[in-house]
Curated annotation (Swiss-Prot):
Its cofactor is Zn(2+). CDD domains: TGS_ThrRS, ThrRS_anticodon, ThrRS_core. This is Threonine--tRNA ligase. One of its GO terms (cellular component) is cytosol. It is found in: Cytoplasm. The lineage of its organism: Bacteria, Pseudomonadati, Pseudomonadota, Gammaproteobacteria, Enterobacterales. Catalyzes the attachment of threonine to tRNA(Thr) in a two-step reaction: L-threonine is first activated by ATP to form Thr-AMP and then transferred to the acceptor end of tRNA(Thr). Also edits incorrectly charged L-seryl-tRNA(Thr). Zn(2+) binds at C333, H384, H510. The gene is thrS. Its EC number is 6.1.1.3. One of its GO terms (molecular function) is metal ion binding. It comes from Wigglesworthia glossinidia brevipalpis.
Length: 636
C-alpha cells in the first residue's frame, strides 16, 4: 500500500498503481502534459507500477530531461519510419545531440535528399495514428532472441558488448517497431510532433574505420512548434555564417578531399592566422613565456613512457623508419618535458614557462570532420609551466587573467567555466588527484570565477579548467584549457633541484588559450559573418577610381597606406564605380576609398565603411589616424 507525496499532499493507495494513475488522482489535468516522472529521485516511465512509498516529481516536455525523453522517443519513430520504407534496413545506434538526435543505419540503398523527405513524410503519417508507446522488461536472453528473430545484427552486438547477460533491460514498442533504450519514453507518440530531418552523413560502426560505413541521419526535435521554427530560423542564419562558405568566398582556405582534415591556407586566410599568432606572441611576452619549436615526429618510446600510448593510442598517427617506430605528435607536452630536462634546473629557475605554436595531428574519425572546426592537423597555442607546489595558485591565476584578456579582444563576454575532475581511465594516486582538483578549485574561487563541476571529464593525467565561449547565436565553443599535471614529470623523470639540494618533480600546468588556431579562426569567421574587425581583416582598405583620370591618385593613396603597413588593395579596372563598390562590399572590406575628380583636385578622400555610411576626410593622414586607433584598440 504505497503512500505517495506530491506538492505537500499525501495519498495512500490500497494497491500497486501506475504513475500515470497516481498523477490523475492528484490532478487529472496534470496527466495530460506529463511525459515521465521521478519517484524518490529515480526517473521512470509513467506506465511504471509503484508498490512502495515515495515522493513524486513530474517531468514535463519543456524540462531539460523532458526534451531528452522526447528526442529518444522520436529517434524510435525515425527507426519505425525507415523500417516501414525499407524493411531490410538494420538499425545500429542512436544518440541525443544538443538540438535533437542522430541514428546510424545500415541500408544497401544510399539515401538521397528526396529519401529524407520521404522518411519525414512517413514519420508524420505514423504520428496521425496517435499510438501509445509500450515498454516491456525482459531478460538479456529474451532480448537477444527477439533481435535475432528480427535480424537486427547491430542490436545483438550491443547486447553482447555492452550489457551483462545477467541483467534485465527495457524494450520499447512503437506498434510493430521494437528497440532498446535506457531512458524512459513518452507515453504517447503525440509528444514527438515537432521535428525536422536535417542531413545525412557517413559514420563507421563504433567510430572505427575498420568497420562498415553506416548512414547517419540527423534530426532536430523539440517540445513545441515555436522552438522548432526558431531553431530552423537560426539554422538558416548559421548557413549564412558557415565558415566553409565564407572561406571560399573570401579565398581563405580549402581542404583537399583526398587529404581530409588537413587545411590548405590561402594568402588571405594565412594573413588572419599570422595576425592571431602575432597577437598571442605579444601576450606571451607580457606574461614571460619562452617560445620553442618541437618536431612533429617523435620516437614511439617517449609516448609509451608518457602514458599516451595506453590512454590515447586510437587518436594517434603512427609511422616507422629503419625498423624504428614513431608517433606523429597529437600534443606538445612530452616534447616540452624533454626541453625542460635537457639540463639540470634549480628551484630558482621556476616557474619555467615555455610555449609553442605546435603542429599536432589527431586521428579523428572521418565522419566527425567539419571544416576548420574539427580537423586532423591543427596548430595548438600550447604552453607548459613547470613550477613548485606553492606556485600553482599564482600561475593558474596568471593563466586565467591571460585567457580573459585574449577573449575580450574578440568581443566574447559570455564565458562558461567548468572544472573537470578525475576520469575513470587515469594515472596517479587519489591523493595526487585530491590535491590537484583542490588547487584548481581554489584558483577559480580566488579569481571570483563562477564555475560548474564536470565530473569524470578530466584528462587522464590531471584535472582541468575548461573555458567555453558563447557566441552571438548562443552556441558553445570550448577553447581554453588549464590542466594541472602532477604525474607526467615523474613518468618522464623530469626534476629540478630544490632548496634542500634534492631532486624533485615539478608540477606541470598545461595551458591553451585559443586551443586550435584553425578552429578559433572558424569560430570568429562565423561570429563576425566574415566581416572581421579591422585589426583582423586580411584586407583592411580597398581603393577604387571613378575614371582613368584618377589612376595616379589611387596609386599614390595605395603607396601611402602600404608604407603605413595597412593591408590595402586597389581596383583600377575600367568598370562602373557601382560595380566596383559592390564587389568590394561582397568581399567584406571594412573601408572603401572612392577617388573621383573632386577628391583628386582637393587631395581628399571619400570613404564608405562596412555599414554603408559615407565619410569625408580632408587628408590621407586624418583617415589613417582614425583607422590606426581602431586597429590599436582592437575594436570589434
Amino acid at each position: 500500500m504505497p503512500i505517495i507525496n506530491f506538492n505537500n499532499k499525501e495519498i495512500l493507495f490500497n494497491y500497486p498503481i501506475s504513475i500515470i494513475e497516481i498523477i490523475k488522482k492528484f490532478d487529472k489535468n496534470l496527466s495530460e502534459n506529463c511525459i515521465a516522472a521521478k519517484i524518490n529521485g529515480k526517473l521512470l516511465d509513467v506506465s511504471e507500477i509503484i508498490n512502495y512509498d515515495g515522493s513524486l516529481e513530474l517531468v514535463k516536455p519543456e524540462n531539460k530531461i523532458g526534451i531528452r525523453i522526447i528526442r529518444c522517443s522520436c529517434s524510435h519513430l525515425l527507426g519505425y519510419a525507415i523500417k516501414q520504407l525499407w524493411p531490410t534496413s538494420k538499425m545500429a545506434t542512436n544518440n541525443i545531440t544538443e538540438n535533437g538526435f542522430y541514428y546510424d543505419i545500415d541500408l544497401n540503398h544510399k539515401l538521397s535528399k528526396n529519401d529524407l523527405k520521404l522518411i519525414e513524410k512517413k514519420m508524420h503519417q505514423l504520428l496521425k495514428i496517435n499510438f501509445k508507446i509500450n515498454k516491456i522488461n525482459v531478460t538479456w536472453g529474451k532480448a537477444y532472441e527477439m533481435f535475432k528473430n528480427l535480424n537486427e545484427i547491430y542490436k545483438i552486438k550491443i547486447l553482447e558488448d555492452n550489457i551483462s547477460k545477467n541483467s534485465s533491460l527495457y524494450i520499447y514498442h512503437q506498434e510493430q517497431y521494437v528497440d532498446l533504450c535506457t531512458l524512459p519514453h513518452v507515453p504517447n507518440i503525440k509528444f514527438c510532433m515537432f521535428f525536422k530531418i536535417q542531413k545525412i552523413s557517413g559514420a563507421y560502426w563504433k567510430g572505427n574505420k575498420k568497420n562498415k560505413m553506416l548512414q547517419r541521419i540527423y534530426v532536430t526535435s523539440w517540445d513545441s512548434n515555436s522552438k522548432l521554427k526558431n531553431f530552423i530560423k537560426n539554422i538558416k542564419e548559421l548557413e549564412h555564417r558557415d565558415h566553409r562558405k565564407i572561406g571560399k568566398k573570401l579565398d581563405l582556405f580549402h581542404i583537399y578531399e583526398n587529404s581530409p582534415g588537413m587545411v590548405f591556407w590561402h594568402h588571405n586566410g594565412w594573413i588572419i592566422f599570422r595576425i592571431l599568432e602575432k597577437f598571442i606572441r605579444k601576450k606571451l611576452k607580457k606574461f614571460y613565456y619562452q617560445e620553442v619549436k618541437t618536431p612533429c615526429i617523435i620516437d614511439h618510446d617517449l609516448w609509451r613512457l608518457s602514458g599516451h600510448l595506453d590512454n590515447y593510442k586510437n587518436y594517434m598517427f603512427h609511422t616507422n623508419s629503419e625498423n624504428k617506430q614513431y608517433c606523429i605528435k597529437p600534443m606538445n607536452c612530452p616534447a616540452h618535458v624533454l626541453i625542460f630536462k635537457k639540463k639540470i634546473r634549480s628551484y630558482k629557475e621556476l616557474p619555467f614557462r615555455i610555449s609553442e605554436f605546435g603542429s599536432c595531428h589527431r586521428n579523428e574519425p572521418s565522419g566527425s570532420l567539419h571544416g576548420l572546426m574539427r580537423i586532423r592537423n591543427f596548430t595548438q597555442d600550447d604552453a607548459h609551466i613547470f613550477c613548485m607546489h606553492d606556485q600553482i595558485l599564482s600561475e593558474v591565476s596568471s593563466c586565467i587573467k591571460m585567457i580573459y584578456e585574449v577573449y575580450s579582444c574578440f568581443g566574447f563576454k559570455k564565458i562558461l567555466v567548468k572544472l573537470s575532475t578525475r576520469p575513470e581511465n587515469r594515472i596517479g594516486s587519489d591523493e595526487i588527484w585530491d590535491f590537484a582538483e583542490k588547487q584548481l578549485e581554489l584558483s577559480l574561487k580566488k579569481n571570483k570565477i563562477l564555475f560548474k563541476i564536470d565530473l569524470n571529464e578530466g584528462a587522464f593525467y590531471g584535472p582541468k579548467i575548461e573555458f567555453t565561449l558563447l557566441d552571438s547565436l548562443n552556441r558553445k565553443w570550448q577553447c581554453g584549457t588549464i590542466q594541472l599535471d602532477l604525474c607526467l614529470a615523474n613518468k618522464l623523470q623530469a626534476y629540478y633541484i630544490n632548496n634542500k639540494n634534492e631532486k624533485t618533480n615539478p608540477v606541470i600546468i598545461h595551458r591553451a588559450i585559443l586551443g586550435s588556431m584553425e578552429r578559433f579562426i572558424g569560430i570568429i569567421t562565423e561570429e563576425f559573418s566574415g566581416k572581421y574587425p579591422l585589426w583582423i581583416s586580411p584586407i583592411q582598405v580597398g581603393v577604387i577610381n571613378v575614371s582613368v583620370d584618377q589612376i595616379d591618385y589611387v596609386k599614390k593613396i595605395t603607396k601611402f597606406f602600404l608604407q603605413k603597413k595597412i593591408r590595402i588593395i586597389s581596383d583600377l579596372r575600367n568598370e562602373k564605380i557601382s560595380f566596383k563598390i559592390r564587389e568590394y562590399t561582397l568581399r567584406f572590406i571594412p573601408y572603401i576609398i572612392i577617388c573621383g575628380k573632386k577628391e583628386m583636385e582637393s587631395n581628399s578622400i571619400s570613404v564608405r565603411n562596412k555599414y554603408g555610411k559615407q565619410l569625408k576626410y580632408s587628408s590621407l593622414e586624418k583617415f589613417y589616424n582614425v583607422i590606426y586607433e581602431e586597429i590599436k584598440q582592437k575594436k570589434t
